[in-house]
């Protein structure tokens, strides 16, 4: 619509059907400033609504809250009663053979595979960012604000990530390890963890 209007006015100018009074008229300038603005607003409003609808997950099988601290992560499984833990990087001298240095944690995030997972992410002190590239997830953790993301793992495995927002001296020592397991394994893990934390 905008291109058609511009081409039409250009054709009229080339054919000299517009006088110099019309070419310099403020009415024409006002129209071709306001008309594109209206078209852009009409395009933006439905797009914003769709953008927020895409971010919402209707019925997740599991909701997990991640809280960034200097310099570790806390996790709360909000669908379970009193199921929460802190996740610290394992120091290199304590690392078992075969584990990745600077990437392994003492408590992994365990999730059921092939289940929609909603992550609610925040921070307790400074800006952090919960990022697991192999899951396609990177969400900022901001103090006083809850950010949300969702994902589904299609296979069992271990997925590594890290805080990707510079948050202080030990920023590089905030690894994230997500372990995707079949549902029966997840259920036994969660019941074992909730029993041991009581």
Curated annotation (Swiss-Prot):
PROSITE patterns: COX2, COX2_CUA, COX2_TM. Coiled coil: none annotated. Keywords: Copper, Electron transport, Magnesium, Membrane, Metal-binding, Mitochondrion, Mitochondrion inner membrane, Respiratory chain, Translocase, Transmembrane, Transmembrane helix, Transport. Its EC number is 7.1.1.9. SUPFAM superfamilies: Cupredoxins, Cytochrome c oxidase subunit II-like, transmembrane region. Cu cation A2 binds at residues 163, 165, 167, 171. It catalyses: 4 Fe(II)-[cytochrome c] + O2 + 8 H(+)(in) = 4 Fe(III)-[cytochrome c] + 2 H2O + 4 H(+)(out). Residues 14-26 are mitochondrial matrix. Residues 55-198 are mitochondrial intermembrane. It holds the Pfam family COX2. Mg(2+) binds at residue 165. Belongs to the cytochrome c oxidase subunit 2 family. Component of the cytochrome c oxidase, the last enzyme in the mitochondrial electron transport chain which drives oxidative phosphorylation. The respiratory chain contains 3 multisubunit complexes succinate dehydrogenase (complex II, CII), ubiquinol-cytochrome c oxidoreductase (cytochrome b-c1 complex, complex III, CIII) and cytochrome c oxidase (complex IV, CIV), that cooperate to transfer electrons derived from NADH and succinate to molecular oxygen, creating an electrochemical gradient over the inner membrane that drives transmembrane transport and the ATP synthase. This is Cytochrome c oxidase subunit 2. It comes from Tinamus major (Great tinamou).
């Amino acid at each position: 619509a905008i291109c058609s209007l511009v081409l039409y006015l250009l054709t009229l100018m080339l054919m000299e059907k517009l006088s110099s009074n019309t070419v310099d008229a403020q009415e024409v300038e006002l129209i071709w400033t306001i008309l594109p603005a209206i078209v852009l607003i009409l395009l933006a409003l439905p797009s914003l609504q769709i953008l927020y609808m895409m971010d919402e997950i209707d019925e997740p099988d599991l909701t997990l809250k991640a809280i960034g601290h200097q310099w570790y992560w806390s996790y709360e499984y909000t669908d379970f009663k009193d199921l929460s833990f802190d996740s610290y990087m394992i120091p290199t001298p304590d690392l078992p053979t075969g584990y990745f240095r600077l990437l392994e944690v003492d408590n992994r995030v365990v999730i059921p595979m092939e289940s929609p997972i909603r992550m609610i992410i925040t921070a307790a002190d400074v800006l952090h960012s919960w990022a697991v590239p192999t899951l396609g997830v990177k969400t900022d953790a901001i103090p006083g604000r809850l950010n949300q993301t969702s994902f589904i793992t299609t296979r069992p495995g271990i997925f590594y990530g890290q805080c990707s927002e510079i948050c202080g001296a030990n920023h590089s020592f905030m690894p994230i390890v997500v372990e995707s397991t079949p549902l029966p394994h997840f259920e036994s893990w969660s019941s074992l963890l909730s029993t041991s934390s009581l």
